[in-house]
A protein has these predicted regions:
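Sec-dependent signal peptide recognition
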Residues: 2-8
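Catalytic centers of hydrolytic enzymes
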Residues: 21-29, 33, 38-48, 52-64, ...
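Acidic, metal/ion-coordinating pockets
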Residues: 19-308, 347-359, 369, 529
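Hydrophobic h-region of N-terminal signal peptides that target proteins for export
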Residues: 10-19
């Protein structure tokens, strides 16, 4: 994808206040990357892994551009999300916290001119991004985020822009993170910070920088999705910037992992893909006469990066780091004592769900855990677990959220959950189904097949209490909570701390709304703790306990008990499950 712009006449007016250049032609190239998410190494870090896009492959591409254009004529920028989201950054973020962080060293090796802090970089937490920013500063690379403001003084927590000289040309690079960061992550990750909308802030900053620094070229790098350009989404302000900015040559965006390039009037915008698979290139030609820029040409394109063509010198330079990361990723972190079968959750309390509840209850002293299955019909085999297996054991990027719920609200929550799960049946009869299933066309086979009527991602059960679910009763009267797991009284008007996932906390499944929390403000007002990703909790659980043992995670005085009644119900639901998945 390639776009070319030629701007003349008014260009002289736009840059008349810039610092003087000698008459002649100046040719620069802006190479832009983003959303690498820690895919730094060309070789796979997992046992049995396959080669894929990498920072080292991007480095080879950048080397080629520099060889063609001249190193002093190439500007290298990144739109963020570089040190969070995969195994390699996890190692340097949370395991080896005493060595110098790898990302600043990699960025220095590639000679980045400026890097933006993406939303995932903030998600790593203060200890990580503060450390990375400090080390990048030592390497001479600014970590930019001009709209991340300190609550203490209202000023940018990270620099808003950087001035660089390339080929005699003065270039201003302004950098911004996602304006919706506060709603995209746990509040503790960004404590003491607030995030401003990019509109009108970026234009205001551009005007100030042009007045103060008098650059010849202005680049805005923002970790924001392209969006629709309608000004309605804080998380997606890329096209808003593209349509409204004046005095800017190049806008680089990220966050949505898209691969796009567009142009209009005197500006181009590029969205740089993900995980080392793409790079943007904008060739800029300035023509100077009488000390003024009288025309400029912008030629923007997106390039696919070949994973097999990587920087072998860079690979050799960081071989020791690769070895440390691979050793950690492929190393044993714990053991699962007995295989866990997820499909059992449909019709009874099971080891698999006890394990999920135990994870939440191990991370914070909650009264009750509320959770749905992660595997619709799967198995977690017994045996050793390597770090690279943690994503298989816990396949989603959920985080722990703890909030206050009354006993009455918990009861309503569970009633709504089981209503999505089961039909009312007073007695068993032929061709009846307790589990809510239906027949519909399977488009992979063209045949009719049994499917769940509702998503099992919203089939929450509870731990920490003892209760029954009566399938003969209608919605609103099925769940009977007898007492707490430890035998103490369960009270409808008492407040309890309950563990849920971030998926549930944003309203997914409608269970909190059914409990009486009508909107996000109602939920936010009840939150008492925001925890880490459950994968991190699982890793810590293994490090502390060594294993997942059903005999330990299923202790009745901790997780409590629940069951379907009357006696025919579990067998009837099991038969329905076998219609779905076979015996």
């Amino acid at each position: 994808m390639k776009i070319k712009l030629i701007i003349a006449a008014m260009a002289a007016l736009a840059v008349s206040a810039c610092s003087t250049l000698k008459d002649g032609e100046y040719n620069l190239s802006v190479v832009s990357t983003g959303d690498g998410h820690g895919y730094w190494f060309a070789k796979p870090i997992e046992a049995g892994g396959k080669a894929r896009g990498s920072l080292m492959a991007q480095s080879a591409f950048v080397n080629g551009v520099r060889a063609e254009k001249g190193a002093d004529n190439v500007i290298l920028v990144d739109a963020g999300d570089n040190f969070f989201g995969s195994g390699a950054p996890f190692y340097y973020n949370y395991v080896d916290t005493t060595s110098s962080h790898l990302y600043p060293r990699l960025a220095s090796y590639m000679k980045y001119d400026a890097v933006v802090a993406g939303h995932s970089d903030f998600e790593s937490g203060h200890r990580v991004y503060d450390r990375v920013a400090k080390e990048m500063k030592k390497e001479g690379i600014p970590l930019l985020a001009g709209n991340a403001l300190s609550d203490r003084n209202g000023k940018p927590y990270f620099p808003a822009y950087s001035i660089i000289k390339k080929g005699g040309v003065k270039v201003a690079v302004l950098g911004y993170t996602n304006a919706a960061n506060a709603s995209l992550m746990d509040g503790s990750c960004v404590s003491g910070l607030r995030f401003e909308s990019l509109l009108p802030l970026v234009q205001e900053d551009v005007d100030k920088v042009r007045s103060k620094e008098k650059p010849h070229i202005v680049i805005v790098v923002a970790h924001t999705a392209m969006g629709k350009g309608d000004g309605l989404k804080l998380e997606k302000q890329g096209l808003d910037l593209f349509k409204s900015l004046r005095g800017v040559d190049v806008v680089v965006t990220g966050h949505d992992h898209a691969n796009k390039v567009m142009s209009a009037d005197s500006i181009v915008v590029l969205d740089c893909g993900r995980t080392g698979q793409n790079a943007g290139v904008t060739d800029i030609k300035l023509v100077v006469k009488g000390g003024k820029v009288v025309s400029r040409t912008l030629d923007a394109r997106m390039t696919s990066i070949k994973s097999e063509e990587y920087d072998t010198a860079m690979e050799e330079a960081f071989e020791a780091d690769y070895d440390k990361v691979r050793s950690f990723i492929t190393g044993t972190v714990g053991e699962i004592k007995k295989g866990l079968v997820s499909r059992e959750f449909y019709y009874k309390q099971c080891d698999y769900m006890n394990f999920l509840h135990a994870l939440a209850m191990s991370a914070y002293p909650v009264d009750i855990s509320l959770s749905a299955t992660l595997l619709i019909d799967g198995k977690v085999p017994a045996g050793e677990v390597r770090y690279q297996d943690i994503r298989k054991v816990y396949p989603y990027e959920n985080k722990l959220v703890v909030l206050r719920l009354t006993g009455a609200e918990i009861l309503k929550y569970l009633e709504a959950s089981y209503d999505a799960w089961i039909n009312t049946m007073t007695e068993p009869y032929e061709n009846a189904h307790v589990l809510k299933i239906k027949q519909s066309k399977d488009y992979s086979t063209g045949k009719m097949a049994w499917k769940l009527a509702k998503s099992p991602a919203n089939f929450d059960s509870a731990a920490g209490i003892n209760y029954t679910v009566d399938v003969t009763k209608p919605y609103g009267s099925r769940v009977v909570i007898t007492d707490m797991a430890d035998g103490s009284k369960f009270e409808l008007d008492k407040e309890y701390t309950a563990a849920i996932t971030t998926y549930r906390s944003v309203g997914s499944g409608g269970l909190l709304k059914a409990a009486g929390l009508e909107d996000m403000k109602s939920v936010e007002d009840r939150i008492v703790y925001r925890g880490p990703e459950f994968r991190t909790i699982l890793y810590r659980y293994f490090k502390k306990n060594g294993s997942i043992d059903p005999a330990v995670v299923g202790v009745p005085k901790v997780v409590g008990s629940w069951k379907f009644v009357p006696e025919f119900a579990p067998a009837a639901i099991k038969a329905d499950v076998e219609l779905l998945y076979g015996k």
